Amino acid sequence: MEIKDQGAQMEPLLPTRNDEEAVVDRGGTRSILKTHFEKEDLEGHRTLFIGVHVPLGGRKSHRRHRHRGHKHRKRDRERDSGLEDGRESPSFDTPSQRVQFILGTEDDDEEHLPHDLFTELDEICWREGEDAEWRETARWLKFEEDVEDGGERWSKPYVATLSLHSLFELRSCILNGTVLLDMHANTIEEIADMVLDQQVSSGQLNEDVRHRVHEALMKQHHHQNQKKLANRIPIVRSFADIGKKQSEPNSMDKNAGQVVSPQSAPACAENKNDVSRENSTVDFSKGLGGQQKGHTSPCGMKQRLDKGPPHQQEREVDLHFMKKIPPGAEASNILVGELEFLDRTVVAFVRLSPAVLLQGLAEVPIPSRFLFILLGPLGKGQQYHEIGRSIATLMTDEVFHDVAYKAKDRNDLVSGIDEFLDQVTVLPPGEWDPSIRIEPPKNVPSQEKRKIPAVPNGTAAHGEAEPHGGHSGPELQRTGRIFGGLILDIKRKAPFFWSDFRDAFSLQCLASFLFLYCACMSPVITFGGLLGEATEGRISAIESLFGASMTGIAYSLFGGQPLTILGSTGPVLVFEKILFKFCKEYGLSYLSLRASIGLWTATLCIILVATDASSLVCYITRFTEEAFASLICIIFIYEALEKLFELSETYPINMHNDLELLTQYSCNCMEPHSPSNDTLKEWRESNLSASDIIWGNLTVSECRSLHGEYVGRACGHGHPYVPDVLFWSVILFFSTVTMSATLKQFKTSRYFPTKVRSIVSDFAVFLTILCMVLIDYAIGIPSPKLQVPSVFKPTRDDRGWFVTPLGPNPWWTIIAAIIPALLCTILIFMDQQITAVIINRKEHKLKKGCGYHLDLLMVAVMLGVCSIMGLPWFVAATVLSITHVNSLKLESECSAPGEQPKFLGIREQRVTGLMIFILMGSSVFMTSILKFIPMPVLYGVFLYMGASSLKGIQLFDRIKLFWMPAKHQPDFIYLRHVPLRKVHLFTVIQMSCLGLLWIIKVSRAAIVFPMMVLALVFVRKLMDFLFTKRELSWLDDLMPESKKKKLEDAEKEEEQSMLAMEDEGTVQLPLEGHYRDDPSVINISDEMSKTAMWGNLLVTADNSKEKESRFPSKSSPS
């Protein structure tokens, strides 16, 4: 931490309280008024005024339990007297434990529930010839922003670095200054009156300067946004009015009907020398002190603040910054500065109850909850500024922030500061420049461990959360009843059915729909084309479009997880090829046998649903998921590049080009020298002969259809050279990939407003496709385009839309079909459930639950329907589903400056999937539009989807570690807990399995691919012998244990909890010399009192107090 100007800073801001003045207030409430109250008048009051401690009648004071306070704090409350320097006596009760106790208590009212805080630091500014005013110099939502020296702009948000000395001085201010908790006030004037009355009563402020300090506090506040908004149309007045109206029910209206105590009004003016009873609590109302001499009335203050044109009477609001403040946030105002007429420091910490909108005090129109006032003599402005930064930074600390809301007295606040000091990290002064602004981190560590007490074994009392989510939950528990899991899925998803449609009203859903429609169209049509080639047109592109649309619509409407996108898979295509070849060799009807197999497969899948077989998904861990997902992503990338290279066969390049012979290059269509029998038969059917055809006048497509030959220097192998088309296709391909990735990252760009960046990022891929289509159309190069069937009818005329399972095949084929159906069932089950597991991971923070059984049922039913109609089978597509989820990610719209938006979850709805497949079915009628989309653009989209889906896969992060020195490796959580050699061993095993899957996938044995995916589960089980359970918990998900093992673990946990409870009930008595068994456990409050810095503060304070007692001020109270 920063330590500077120590000579000036060693002088304390406040003298320490001694026995003659006041003992450090260990009570919950102190009245600043010298008025006698009866006990029954004081009980049950919430307002706390922590100030002077004056014993009554020589009676030894004791702490009393408040009716709404803590119930178990006797050991702290019964310490009535402290040391002269304000320190508590040594104790093993550490600040961390006290803070955990404070945060663990629950108040009966909602008034002390913590809210988000906006903190503003204002400093009083004096200029010659001008009236003084409060100027905003810094603000905090999460990180610090300063007004730059020029005063024209805000700095970038940065992590606040504080000097240790300023934190010590802040602690001294809270210990010895005025602390007013739960003050009832409606205006800044009332707050100033109460604070100054407290200061005068306690002898911290002279009566003759009270009026001048009050005037200083009433000075107008000038905020940084006022200058740049001064000339704008005051439309923002309505926004301020909204904030005012939201706050008035909690401020003016609530207090309007309060009855002022008959003793409270004259208390300040007349009874200043009376002795107040300890624990006195006074409910100050808005009329308190309003008639005192020298005070400015609220009306007078309003007249002074409302100078200027009418449109400036309501302060301008920075709407852009206002959007970053969370709903329900409150303000804490820090007021520091130098006053020439002060000879000692005025310090006050105020908590309002309820929070009140103080017009003109904060930059934004939100209710103020806390005020910290620090005014002192000239010459210590920088010191005051650093203390103001310290309290503002503390207010942004998650733990102290909660302590400030729940504190019952001064000691609670001091404990919060001590706990903060116990957690801070100190930077050596010789190795760090404090003027360097630290950039906000991308991820801020959780502070929950600071709030939860620890048990003897070092873990949190409430248990340590798993490092990452597995697949446990009610969705995967066996019910023991037929269709029990399916019934629970329906009950779980039914309440969200209508919200699945309402939640889709967002531009993000429109962007996702347009992007994925283009992404899904091409593979469906391509798959149909390949299937048509393999089955001689029995199932082709039109059947593929119709089947995908029908299956997708049904699944999107009634599926358990509508975020899953259905598509075609490679193993299905391999199975279709093998089946067609088998039927052709044995003279069987392919479509009929396929229908029988499909119906058996659907029946077996329904049996799996009835027996809750989806509960076996819990054995699919991250190890299997990542291997499967990585393979599919790599296949997408590989096939995209393969399709691009295949264009070189259709549009070849002359690799032996000679620029000097360009005038001699030509390519002509000639009669084939030796036409094949098929060619001659085709000519005869068309009533043509070789002599009837004028070969030299034929176009390229006509020459190809008549099986002519290309002759000439500009001809390749069966095609003319077309270099511009291939090169242009390559340009389109890589431009699509680059532009998609760039626009997707545009959300984090520094250009344009946030809303524009967000829209561009959501529509990134669609905008890319649109731009590439326009550019391709403008250039005019005939690149290959998307071909969509233009007529809705079966590809072959000899088949209809329905197929009988038996057909012309023998009867026994229906029974024999169960054998290949078993293999198909494994294929469908593994593809569907692994994809569902990836989509339903806890990292996605899905709130509407999942439905593994319902998903499998819908896939099984539609598989049976597609089999009867002779349509392709569709199952969950991994990459398309991951892309769908990534396109619907939700992030916090209201994030503090410098804070990374928080991932909130996924926009769960059914509309995007539904619209994708509805439009896909309508594509037959949109061929006039779709024919403009170049195929290289869609190949580029495939590559982008495959590459973007690899992000977040831990396997590739671990692969990078092989080439990184240890000192340059990222701070992955598993590297902290698992030896690097074990991490590498885990990665090698996973890469070996991935390589084996790849070999099987691209070979003729691709039909057994699902069996190999299933084998990964057993490989993972064998890894229990190579790695410990703890190592696997960090590198992978833990697999379910046997019932006996679970019972043993439960017994061990119960024993540990019993030991923890016994330990909590044990009373530890310190030995002589305060010996501690564990040297790592210290009390920061006790250790701080032993430091020379704190001691110097106390010694100087005592000297200052002694000097003041020798030469008392005339106006100081007796």
UniProtKB/Swiss-Prot annotation:
Keyword presence, Hydrolase: no
Cytoplasmic face residues: 1-509, 560-562, 618-626, 742-762, 831-855, 934-935, 1020-1118
Protein location: Basolateral cell membrane; Apical cell membrane; Cell projection, Dendrite; Cell projection, Axon
Organism expressing this protein natively: Mus musculus (Mouse)
UniProt modified residues of type Phosphothreonine: 94
Family (UniProt): Belongs to the anion exchanger (TC 2.A.31) family.
Biased composition (Basic residues): 59-76
Catalytic activity as recorded in UniProt: 2 hydrogencarbonate(out) + chloride(in) + Na(+)(out) = 2 hydrogencarbonate(in) + chloride(out) + Na(+)(in)
Residues bearing carbohydrate: 677, 687, 697
Post-translational modification: N-glycosylated.
Tissue specificity statement from the Swiss-Prot or TrEMBL entry: In the brain, detected in cerebral cortex, subcortex, cerebellum, hippocampus and medulla (at protein level). In the cerebrum, expressed at high levels throughout the cortex, at lower levels in striatum and not detectable in the corpus callosum (at protein level). In the cerebellum, detected at high levels in the molecular layer but at very low levels in the granular layer (at protein level). In the central nervous system, detected in neurons in the olfactory bulb, cortex and cerebellum (at protein level). Within the hippocampus, abundantly expressed in CA3 pyramidal cells (at protein level).
PANTHER family: ANION EXCHANGE PROTEIN (PTHR11453), SODIUM-DRIVEN CHLORIDE BICARBONATE EXCHANGER (PTHR11453:SF32)
Stretches for region Disordered: 1-23, 58-97, 269-310, 457-476
Ranges facing Extracellular side: 531-538, 584-596, 648-720, 784-809, 877-912, 957-998
Biased amino acid composition, Basic and acidic residues: 77-90
GO cellular component, one term: GABA-ergic synapse
Topology term for the membrane: Multi-pass membrane protein
Transmembrane intervals: 510-530, 539-559, 563-583, 597-617, 627-647, 721-741, 763-783, 810-830, 856-876, 913-933, 936-956, 999-1019
Name of this protein: Sodium-driven chloride bicarbonate exchanger
Lineage: Eukaryota, Metazoa, Chordata, Craniata, Vertebrata
Keyword flag Zinc: yes
Function: Sodium/bicarbonate cotransporter which plays an important role in regulating intracellular pH. Has been shown to act as a sodium/bicarbonate cotransporter in exchange for intracellular chloride. Has also been shown to act as a sodium/biocarbonate cotransporter which is not responsible for net efflux of chloride, with the observed chloride efflux being due to chloride self-exchange. Controls neuronal pH and may contribute to the secretion of cerebrospinal fluid.
One GO process term, biological-process aspect: response to light stimulus
Modified residues (Phosphoserine): 89, 276, 1057, 1085
Observed phenotype of the null mutant: Homozygotes are born at the expected Mendelian ratio but most pups die around weaning. When fed soft food from the second week of life onward, most pups catch up with the weight of their wild-type littermates and survive. Adults display normal weight and lifespan, are fertile and do not display major behavioral abnormalities. However, brain ventricle size is drastically reduced and mutants show diminished Na(+)-dependent recovery of pH following acid loading of choroid plexus epithelial cells.
